[in-house]
Design a protein with these regions (language model features):
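Acceptor/aglycone-binding surface of glycosyltransferases and processive sugar-polymer synthases
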Residues: 67, 73-88, 105-186, 190, ...
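Short aromatic/hydrophobic "clamp" motif used to bind/position activated sugar donors
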Residues: 94
Length: 247
């Protein structure tokens, strides 16, 4: 069990980075199970154009019994949102839930159990195990993700089947260690996920993957520009290769 937290039912912060996700804000709260006694929800809002911020304020008022906070991004991108949210989180355990809800909030208790029972210290969701909604991960996306997972598994000497799944879970203590090591990899991480993966493997944390059902988004448009992100990912691979394999 969790020696570095030292409690059986540790508090948790669920971080929800969101930009133009007005239609998903309330569902995230409604569908999130109460899997621990002390659950904090932090929305980090990315200067949306569709009234997402107003909707978050409405939801905070509508659910007074839940501990929901909102922060507005100064910078841009998911990486910036994750850093801002986690820096302000009070939970012993930190989780990321993407606001598009393609990873069902109902699956988060599995991540909680995996970290609390000591199965792993860095829990990564994987969307490649369960069958997916037809629309959820298009063919090109699926193969790109497969390819990058193989590359990153080789680079990091850890098996990752899905490096791009948005749901990651780790303890606040380990997150703080990753932050103090961050200069090693620099701030080049437009996705906000890879500095956590790099940092976790550099600290030799025990990485465990939790399979999740991956659903098509119900509201809004995907904010992934495939080719731009593919190019950025390729740069990340080369960058990591220089850092990790050329010693």
């Amino acid at each position: 069990p969790m020696q570095d937290v030292g409690v059986n039912n540790p508090s948790t912060t669920v971080l929800i980075p969101c930009r133009n996700e007005k239609g998903n804000i309330e569902n995230a709260v409604k569908r999130l199970p109460n899997f621990c006694d002390d659950l904090e929800i932090i929305y980090v809002e990315g200067n949306s154009q569709d009234g997402t911020l107003d909707e978050i304020h409405r939801v905070i008022k509508a659910y007074p019994d839940k501990d929901i906070k909102v922060l507005v991004q100064d910078g841009k991108g998911k990486g910036d949102a994750v850093r801002k949210g986690f820096d302000n989180a009070r939970g012993d355990i930190l989780m990321i839930l993407d606001a598009d809800l393609t990873v069902p909030p109902e699956d988060l208790p599995k991540f909680y159990r995996a970290i609390v029972t000591g199965k792993g210290e860095y829990i990564n969701g994987t969307r490649l195990v369960y069958p997916m909604d037809d629309q959820a991960m298009r063919f090109l996306n699926f193969w790109a993700n497969r390819t990058f997972s193989v590359l990153f598994s080789w680079l990091l000497n850890q098996r990752f089947t899905d490096t791009l799944c948005g749901t990651k879970v780790l303890t606040k203590k380990n997150y703080e260690k990753i932050v103090s090591n961050r200069s090693y990899f620099g701030d080049f991480d437009p996705f906000g996920d890879f500095d956590l993966i790099f940092g976790a493997t550099k600290l030799n944390l025990k990485v465990v993957e939790v399979p999740i059902r991956y659903a098509a988004r119900e509201y809004g448009e995907t904010q992934i520009s495939r080719f731009r992100h593919g190019w950025l990912l390729l740069k990340m691979v080369l960058f990591a290769y220089k850092k990790l394999k050329i010693v």
